[in-house]
């Protein structure tokens, strides 16, 4: 049978997966996939203790693979704001099941690259989006992420959106 891509979409801080799911409906209707929009275990994603939410996300991927015909080459982790930041944290771990990352309006700490396995970053497709008018995380944060990830060998597509602030 036909395999479908899996998209795991992470909401922003104090958000909820049920609400974030709605922002994806049009895209899913035009480009079919299996979509999971989980809710963080706390008020936001466990940025300081990544294992807490990372293990849950790994479990969701495994569940999806058991129940649907998932394309193993197209497993995307994306997120908005804190969800985007967590997509870096979780998606860059060496045991990550995700084949693609797409952080949006996310924070990125350069120290993160010091704990990333160079083999994990090498060739990893990352679609990085950030609004030029972002008031929460300045666009310079995304520019630094683009530079650091590209230098590590990731295949980064960088998209700075001219009139976008901190939104999706």
Feature map (PLM): residue ranges:
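A domain-start/cap signature at the N-terminus of enzymes
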Residues: 1-6, 82, 90, 143-157
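Short substrate-entry loop that stabilizes the transition state in hydrolases
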Residues: 1-46, 110
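Loop/turn elements at helix/coil->beta-strand transitions in domains of secreted/extracellular proteins
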Residues: 2-6, 31-34, 71-74, 95-100, ...
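Gly/Ser-rich "nucleophile elbow"/oxyanion-hole loop immediately N-terminal to the catalytic nucleophile
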Residues: 2-3, 45-82, 97
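Cell-envelope and extracellular/periplasmic
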Residues: 11-15, 41, 65-68, 80, ...
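Short, surface-exposed alpha-helical segments at coil->helix boundaries
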Residues: 18, 22, 54, 58, ...
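Primarily recognizes the serine-hydrolase "nucleophile elbow" in alpha/beta-hydrolase
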Residues: 73-121
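The feature captures the conserved acid-bearing segment of alpha/beta-hydrolase catalytic domains
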Residues: 100, 105-168
